[in-house]
């Protein structure tokens, strides 16, 4: 039987790369006819993924990485209006190089005695411009959405509203009714790029979704039944494959750059804490706060009386990933470290998030509501208090609280970079609430965690969905 090669083009950045790597590993585990080529576009922003991808390539002979050459003339960041536009236009500049690489792959497979065919191009949200390459080479294209079905519903609806000139994004405007999302969505929880008037990049991306042969989504039927059922009954939407949770359960332990001593210190401290007694604060690879907000968080934690593990990152120059704090005493209230650090709490920089969420001492999570973090918290049965910051995180937080009842509302509409400072009392209330032992939110999260584990096992909904995707790809070859 013919072997098939799938070419993946993920967006740069951990939130896109890591789910892609986990998904392709799942594909090759399921079918020995499949091999994977990942076209690696260097990030516009500094990242720490290269060592991890190299370790994957070394350990998985059917996964290879090809670096896409950088364009000679890279427009300066100041030319772009939004992060979405930076990503999409920067990636568009790689189209000629990607076309050349895939053309060579197709040509070499046609001339090879190994009988391996390039069967599909799988692109990320910000890489939909590569669909044109697939069309030119007569290769089916699929979208791999590392976010959720609700976000897919939003993106599919966006071009429709644009055509009707019905996009209203001022906070005073009426709520949006979006097919696939149960409750009307207030404009204040829409992605910041929309409410700031930077709409064109999102519409350009969203308008390409329906051109694909199928859409793979990092979710599972039991979590987002409403949206997935709607997609399956809509002939205008390509087949949707809910394959999640696709999460890095190894927590990137293969990263050579991760500080093993830091990890050991964190886990040893957690080992000494009572079961479900620690609230974990972590805000993603791009999440950080200024000094005033850091002090309010510290006061709120101390007032709450709860044990805490706080991944504290400080802002860096625009476009640079936040860094660990070099001098905690400068940004924390006087005496805070002496009163809490190592006793009631532990402050760190980088933290092994999945390992922390899996630890029996962890009882709650104050999170930015990135989709990977939400899936990891559900998997391990740890409830979230919402503190969204950027991208679609406000919409994620809104749906987790209002639609699914699986998160505690602290803020739904906070946006990174705003002058808004969340006060200590509000933080205290959220921390105490998310740590409540017998709350309805905790019960729902723990039950959904069990469903998530069933979904990816043989006989589960996501296991079946991965099988359907493989059949669709192989069936054409």
From Swiss-Prot:
Q: Which domain of life is it from?
A: Eukaryota
Alphabetically sorted, this entry's keywords are: Glycosyltransferase, Transferase
Q: What task does this protein carry out?
A: Glycosyltransferase that possesses chalcone and flavonol 2'-O-glycosyltransferase activity. Converts phloretin to phlorizin (phloretin 2'-O-glucoside), a potent antioxidant. Possesses glycosyltransferase activity toward quercetin, isoliquiritigenin, butein and caffeic acid.
* Temperature behavior of the protein's activity: Optimum temperature is 40 degrees Celsius.
The top EC class is: transferase
Q: What is the recorded name of this protein?
A: UDP-glycosyltransferase 71K1
Q: Which organism is it from?
A: Malus domestica
What family classification does the UniProt entry report for this protein? Belongs to the UDP-glycosyltransferase family.
Q: List the disulfide bonds.
A: none
- One MF term in GO for this entry? UDP-glucosyltransferase activity
């Amino acid at each position: 039987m013919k072997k098939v090669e799938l070419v993946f083009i993920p967006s740069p950045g951990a939130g896109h790369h890591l789910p892609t790597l986990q998904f392709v590993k799942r594909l090759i585990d399921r079918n020995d006819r499949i091999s994977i080529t990942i076209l690696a576009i260097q990030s516009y922003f500094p990242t720490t993924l290269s060592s991890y991808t190299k370790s994957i390539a070394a350990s998985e002979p059917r996964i290879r990485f090809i670096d896409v050459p950088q364009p000679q003339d890279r427009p300066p960041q100041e030319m772009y209006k939004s992060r979405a536009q930076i990503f999409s236009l920067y990636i568009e500049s790689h189209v000629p190089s990607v076309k050349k690489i895939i053309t060579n792959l197709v040509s070499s497979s046609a001339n090879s005695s190994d009988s391996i065919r390039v069967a599909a191009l799988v692109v990320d949200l910000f890489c939909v411009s590569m669909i044109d390459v697939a069309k030119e080479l007569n290769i089916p294209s699929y979208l791999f959405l590392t976010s959720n079905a609700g976000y897919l519903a939003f993106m599919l609806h966006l071009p429709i509203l644009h055509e009707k000139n019905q996009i209203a994004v001022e906070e005073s405007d009426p709520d949006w009714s979006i097919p696939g999302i149960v409750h009307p969505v207030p404009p204040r929880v829409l992605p910041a790029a929309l409410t700031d008037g930077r709409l064109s990049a999102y519409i350009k991306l969203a308008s390409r979704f329906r051109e694909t042969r199928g859409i793979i989504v990092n979710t599972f039927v039991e979590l987002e039944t409403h949206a997935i059922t709607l997609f399956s009954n809509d002939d205008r939407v390509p087949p949707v494959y809910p394959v999640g949770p696709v999460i890095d359960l190894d927590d990137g332990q293969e990263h050579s750059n991760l500080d093993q001593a830091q990890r050991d210190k964190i886990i040893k401290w957690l080992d000494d804490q009572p079961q479900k007694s620690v609230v974990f604060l972590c805000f993603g690879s791009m999440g950080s706060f200024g000094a005033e907000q850091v002090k309010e968080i510290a006061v709120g934690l101390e007032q709450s009386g709860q044990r805490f593990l706080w991944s504290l990152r400080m802002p860096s120059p625009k476009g640079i990933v936040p860094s660990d704090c070099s001098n905690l005493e400068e940004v924390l209230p006087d005496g805070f470290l002496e009163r809490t650090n190592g006793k009631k709490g532990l402050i760190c920089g980088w933290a092994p998030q999945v390992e922390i969420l899996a630890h029996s001492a962890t009882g709650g999570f104050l999170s930015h509501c990135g989709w990977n973090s939400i899936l990891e918290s559900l998997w391990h049965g740890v409830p979230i208090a919402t503190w969204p910051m950027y991208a679609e995180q406000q919409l994620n937080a809104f749906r987790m609280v209002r639609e699914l009842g699986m998160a505690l509302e602290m803020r739904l509409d906070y946006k990174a970079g705003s002058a808004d400072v969340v006060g200590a009392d509000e933080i205290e209330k959220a921390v105490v609430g998310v740590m409540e032992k017998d709350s309805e939110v905790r019960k729902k999260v723990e039950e959904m965690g069990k469903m998530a584990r069933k979904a990816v096992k043989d006989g589960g909904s996501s296991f079946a969905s991965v099988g359907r995707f493989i059949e669709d790809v192989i069936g054409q070859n």
